[in-house]
């Protein structure tokens, strides 16, 4: 990590009040910490927009495992793309519903393609890809 450099930011008073309220709500000790997180968030988003960059993310799926062949179809799709899946966790939410969390890593395009294929599988009740970073491009 390089040296820390101070710089100024000019905001109108209403925006600053909202930002300070957000900092309090999120328990940031200083505005600088919040601004650093905002910048990192934009940089992670930029990584994801470059489809050849290696990215990481977590895909969350909720589905009824009693739905005909659904669990088998999801497993088959996961096996087809095993090189993108680092880890998976399967949780029984109740008698019918399961939550599956997949940790993904690979080229952005491959991660997004696999996520969309799993989310759009007939019978999946909920699916969301949470963007993350490998940390290699973030300081």
Swiss-Prot record:
Summary of the function given for this chain in its UniProt record: Transcriptional regulator.
A Pfam cross-reference name: NikR_C
Gene3D superfamilies the record matches: ACT-like. Chain A, domain 2, Met repressor-like
Protein name in the entry: Putative nickel-responsive regulator
Cofactors: Ni(2+)
Binding positions for Ni(2+) per the UniProt entry: 79, 90, 92, 98
Gene Ontology biological-process entries: response to nickel cation
Organism: Solidesulfovibrio magneticus (strain ATCC 700980 / DSM 13731 / RS-1) (Desulfovibrio magneticus)
């Amino acid at each position: 990590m390089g040296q820390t450099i101070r710089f100024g930011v000019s905001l109108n008073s209403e925006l600053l009040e909202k930002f300070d309220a957000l900092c309090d709500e999120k328990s940031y000790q200083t505005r600088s910490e919040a601004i650093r997180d905002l910048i990192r968030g934009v940089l992670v988003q930029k990584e994801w927009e470059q489809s050849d960059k290696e990215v990481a993310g977590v895909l969350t799926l909720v589905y009824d495992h009693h739905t005909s062949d659904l669990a088998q179809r999801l497993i088959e799709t996961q096996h087809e793309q095993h090189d993108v899946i680092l880890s998976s966790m399967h949780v029984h939410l109740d008698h019918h519903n399961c939550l599956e969390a997949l940790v993904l890593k690979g080229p952005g395009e491959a991660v997004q393609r696999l996520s969309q294929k799993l989310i759009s599988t007939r019978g999946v009740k909920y699916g969301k890809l949470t963007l993350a970073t490998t940390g290699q491009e973030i300081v």
